[in-house]
């Protein structure tokens, strides 16, 4: 019996072994899952990032606030970059740039339109003025706010110069701020679509849009220049400062096919600068300034700043004087004035001014506006006032107000 038990135990052991082996072999009737080593897939590499690592001097590294944080664009692609909003952005200043300047310009534009909050690049000229190029972008694009004297408050961190590697921070290029711009853009499209049918010519449409801006936007000052959206405020709130007026008007003009750009000027020391629009009326460039329609003290109900020459500009545009469009045609200047003269000091002109002023007074109009198409200094004003007083004997009271521009002047004569 002992040997029988051993044999039975051996038989059972062999049977279990055979069963186990059978279970591990492929059997079409009883398929068994195979246990293999887990395959490990290598993470996909970003080819642009790899190219950047090998040659960072020919790439721009853009940064966003969300993942993936880094985005790499080669110089060659940025040189050819075209705005995603060709009906909204102009190219007047961009078309005059090349090389590094154009790469920097397009880096700002690329970051703005794709909501990147910063970028890094290498430049050959570490002293290059990025702020100057950024201003050119703001003059071509209504989507980039700019204020001449308070610009640093808009940009949260100043531009850092690290050798030849430049780091630019733009914390205002966010999704929420871009949505505000798109809301304003949508409203501008509605304004253009609603131009009445009787405005057929391009000039008539320009006049309608200019009047719309003047009638629906008022000038306000801001307690802080930080984080403000002047374009959005102009279009959607109906209040802004000169930047917002110009952003809105330039965009509306482009939407009807008018070639235009914005222009910035410097005031006297201690005064703020100013922004307005230069646009083509027919084949000629003129200045357009809806801000001054609201803030001007000139007593005229007519539009005073729809199309005028550089002679009527009081601001200095020294930073890019050679780049901006020149407005040399003076035929539209002082279209709102009651008369124009070429001199204030000749007896003949003074007599004519007195005669017209007294005729207007007799008709119940106490104010006469005189456009002087020549430079006028303080000594000439004194001579004019003395001679005017000699001839204006019918008036009990005479008061004169003057506005001096670059090569012209305006005189307001009030008689009683």
Mark where each language-model region is.
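Gram-positive cell-envelope targeting signals
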Residues: 1-50, 176, 209, 237-249, ...
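N-terminal accessory/pre-domain segments preceding catalytic cores
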Residues: 19-200, 314-416
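Solvent-exposed loop/turn segments at secondary-structure junctions
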Residues: 175, 215-220, 240-242, 267-271, ...
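Secondary-structure boundary elements
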Residues: 178-234
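Generic solvent-exposed, charged/amphipathic alpha-helical segments
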Residues: 210-214, 250, 382-389
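Acidic/polar residues at beta-strand termini and the immediately following turn/coil
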Residues: 219, 289, 403-407
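Short clusters of hydrophobic/aromatic residues that line enzyme substrate/ligand-binding pockets
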Residues: 234-235, 306
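Hydrophobic/aromatic-rich core segments of domains that either
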Residues: 244-311
